[in-house]
Every structure is written in structure tokens, then in C-alpha cells.
């Protein structure tokens, strides 16, 4: 495994530039999340979390993933929030299945496991319907039909292909490679394959909402636009937490710096301009298309931003608390407060029972089963001895 890079210090963080870039994006999309009432949001969170927690508490899933309960709980809470807040017009069943699929991707993204030793027969095993050598692929292949059933064939193919791309992107990240100087195509290449943009862009359109053939051209365009918008927005809002995370030093912004020889402020500005341009294009392209599709996209944008501003993973409350009193900082604070009014939901309202509790119950069942089997074995031995 390649050594991870040093993490920069707090004093080096470009706080003023970062606040300005976030505010510029929030202004561009006219951020104001009205996707749910409080009761609706909690109801959807509770349903999706419950279904996903049951899935990940299964003994064979736990044994294969070997993820500590605390990390599993954090990952599940994060992804359920993303799927509910962003996919606000789909059924609760779709939210739940997407929550499970994207939790698998988050767990892989946070993993440090080197996959090379288990991937030599990946395609051969897939072609011959043999179990994959890599445990993550065994679980994902087993579950993904539950997700795909909600979509038409075109979106299904995009989602599967994008998931494969994502795995390869995580594989590259295991090498902590920011790219060679002068390779200006590398940062975008890596971000496209590890961003799940096509999977997300396709999964916005389940057949319960949209006829795939009727809206084929709009769906294709939306996938093309969301490929960049979704990952660039994520890069912008996750920049703070990734800046201080040892595992996340191969971020898009850092890769721009390494490959193009520009400063961190210049790289942030580049990301901001690209994200704003993408946001403007989505609005301009779809505002005169089918009203339902425009509404789905704009509500996705609002919810996706709310999720980032509220989820503990992104630590943006720290940025909020450290923001000063200048006009840009004050504007960011107002946006953050607006997001938290609708999106900062106490986990006790929906993480019940928690995935940790469900895992403990399953372990207790297994332990009781082993004790029962052992007791029966002792009785059988005694009977056998008496019979002799």
C-alpha cells in the first residue's frame, strides 16, 4: 500500500475563498429547500433507515464487510439522508433500495483494502455466474437487482456501468496518486469514474415517475449534466472535511494543484466556476422541457445541497461556527441556518432501532444457537454412552 500524504494544518486552510465559493453556488441555485414537511422527512428517513439497517445487520453481510459497528452506523445515517433528501419524489421503497446500494459504495470509498489480489478473475466469474473473489462484489451483485427493478433497461445499464467505474476509481485512490505534473486530463478522468455521476443521474428516473422511452432524450441529457454537477457539488461541500483527512488527499482540487501546477485558491476557483456553469446549464436546458422532469431535477439539487450542509460527515457546522462577520460569512450562515431548519433531524427520531442494535441482536441469536447446538451435542453424547 502506498504511503498516505501529510495532512495540512488548520492555519493553511483557505477559509475566505471557501466561504465565497459556497455562497456563489448557493446564490446560483437560489437555495431554499422546500422538498418536505418535517413529518414527511422523518417518515421517509425512518422507513429507508429501517430497511437498510435490517439489510446490513444480516450476519453474512457483517462477516463479509468486516466494518466496525460505529463506522457502519455513521455510513448508513449519511447515505439514508442523501437518498431521502435528494430523491424526494420517489417512493419510500426506492429510497430504501438506493440507500442500501449507495451505502455499499460509501463503505468501499472509505476502505483501505487493496483489491488487486481478488480481481484477476472478475470478468470470468461474472460471465460464468460464479461468486466473486472480492467480498464487496459478492454482496453488491447479490443486492443490485433489487435496485435495478425500479428502472428501465437504459438506466439500469448506466447504473451498473457506473458502479463498475466507481470500483476502479476507488482502486486508483488506494495508490494515493494525484497525477503527474502536466497531465491535465487526469483529475477529471479520476473524478468521472469514481464519482458515480452516471449511476446517480440515472437513478433519479425510476419508472414509477418517468417513462424511459418517452423521455429518453431528456434522461440522457440529465445524466450528462448530473455526471459533473453532482460530483463537483460534492467536491465543493466536502472540501473542508477532505482537507484534513489523510484518506482524502487525492481530491479533485488537490489533483488540479498537482497536475496543473496551480495554487489551492486557483483550484478552488476553477471548481467553483465549473459547478456554477453546470448549475446554470441544468436550469437553462430543462426550464422549458417537461415540467415534471424540471421539478425532479431542481428538487434533487435543493435536497442534495441540504444534505451536505447538515450531515455530520462534511463537518460544515465547523465552518459555520468559525465564520466571521463579513458579508460573505454572514450570507453563508443564513444559508446554513436555512438548511439546518429543515435538514438537521435528530437521529433518535428515525434511527430506531439502530443498525448497531440490530447487529448485536443477530450476534446474540447466533451465540444462543451455538450454545443450543453445543447442549444438544452433549446430551447426544451422554445418550450414546449409556447405550453402549
From Swiss-Prot:
Enzyme Commission number(s) from the entry: 4.2.3.6
Induction: Expression is positively regulated by the cluster-specific transcription factor TRI6.
Gene3D superfamilies (alphabetical): Farnesyl Diphosphate Synthase
Binding site for Mg(2+) 3: 248
GO molecular function, one term: trichodiene synthase activity
Cofactor: Mg(2+); Mn(2+)
Function: Trichodiene synthase; part of the gene cluster that mediates the production of the antimicrobial trichothecene harzianum A (HA) that plays a role in Botrytis cinerea antagonistic activity and plant defense priming. The biosynthesis of harzianum A begins with the cyclization of farnesyl diphosphate to trichodiene and is catalyzed by the trichodiene synthase TRI5. Trichodiene undergoes a series of oxygenations catalyzed by the cytochrome P450 monooxygenase TRI4.
Other comment: Trichothecenes are sesquiterpenoid toxins that act by inhibiting protein biosynthesis.
Protein name: Trichodiene synthase
Native species: Trichoderma arundinaceum
Amino acid at each position: 500500500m502506498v504511503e498516505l500524504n501529510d495532512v495540512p494544518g488548520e492555519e493553511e486552510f483557505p477559509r475566505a475563498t471557501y466561504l465565497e465559493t459556497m455562497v456563489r453556488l448557493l446564490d446560483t441555485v437560489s437555495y431554499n429547500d422546500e422538498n418536505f414537511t418535517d413529518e414527511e422527512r422523518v417518515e421517509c428517513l425512518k422507513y429507508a433507515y429501517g430497511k437498510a439497517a435490517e439489510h446490513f445487520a444480516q450476519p453474512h453481510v457483517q462477516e463479509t464487510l468486516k466494518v466496525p459497528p460505529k463506522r457502519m452506523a455513521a455510513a448508513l445515517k449519511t447515505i439514508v439522508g442523501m437518498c431521502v433528501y435528494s430523491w424526494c419524489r420517489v417512493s419510500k421503497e426506492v429510497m430504501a433500495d438506493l440507500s442500501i446500494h449507495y451505502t455499499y459504495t460509501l463503505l468501499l470509498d472509505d476502505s483501505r483494502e487493496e483489491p488487486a489480489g481478488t480481481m484477476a478473475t472478475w470478468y470470468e466469474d461474472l460471465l460464468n455466474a460464479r461468486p466473486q473473489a472480492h467480498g464487496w462484489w459478492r454482496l453488491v451483485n447479490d443486492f443490485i437487482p433489487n435496485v435495478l427493478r425500479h428502472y428501465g433497461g437504459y438506466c439500469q445499464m448506466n447504473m451498473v456501468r457506473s458502479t463498475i467505474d466507481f470500483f476502479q476509481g476507488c482502486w486508483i485512490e488506494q495508490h494515493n496518486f494525484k497525477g503527474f505534473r502536466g497531465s491535465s486530463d487526469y483529475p477529471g478522468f479520476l473524478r468521472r469514474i469514481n464519482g458515480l455521476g452516471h449511476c446517480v443521474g440515472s437513478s433519479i428516473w425510476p419508472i414509477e415517475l418517468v417513462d424511459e422511452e418517452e423521455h429518453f432524450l431528456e434522461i440522457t441529457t440529465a445524466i450528462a449534466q448530473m455526471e459533473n454537477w453532482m460530483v463537483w457539488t460534492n467536491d465543493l461541500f466536502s472540501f473542508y472535511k477532505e482537507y484534513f483527512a489523510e484518506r482524502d488527499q487525492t481530491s479533485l482540487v488537490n489533483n488540479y494543484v498537482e497536475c496543473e501546477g496551480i495554487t489551492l485558491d486557483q483550484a478552488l476557483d476553477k471548481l467553483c466556476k465549473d459547478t456554477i456553469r453546470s448549475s446554470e446549464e441544468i436550469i437553462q436546458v430543462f426550464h422549458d422541457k417537461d415540467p415534471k422532469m424540471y421539478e425532479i431535477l431542481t428538487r434533487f439539487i435543493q435536497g442534495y445541497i441540504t444534505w451536505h450542509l447538515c450531515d455530520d460527515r462534511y463537518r460544515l457546522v465547523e465552518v459555520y461556527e468559525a465564520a466571521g462577520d463579513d458579508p460573505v460569512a454572514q450570507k453563508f450562515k443564513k444559508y446554513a441556518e436555512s438548511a439546518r431548519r429543515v435538514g438537521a433531524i435528530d437521529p433518535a427520531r428515525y434511527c430506531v432501532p439502530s443498525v448497531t442494535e440490530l447487529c448485536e441482536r443477530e450476534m446474540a441469536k447466533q451465540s444462543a444457537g451455538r450454545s443450543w447446538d453445543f447442549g444438544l451435542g452433549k446430551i447426544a453424547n451422554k445418550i450414546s454412552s449409556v447405550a453402549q
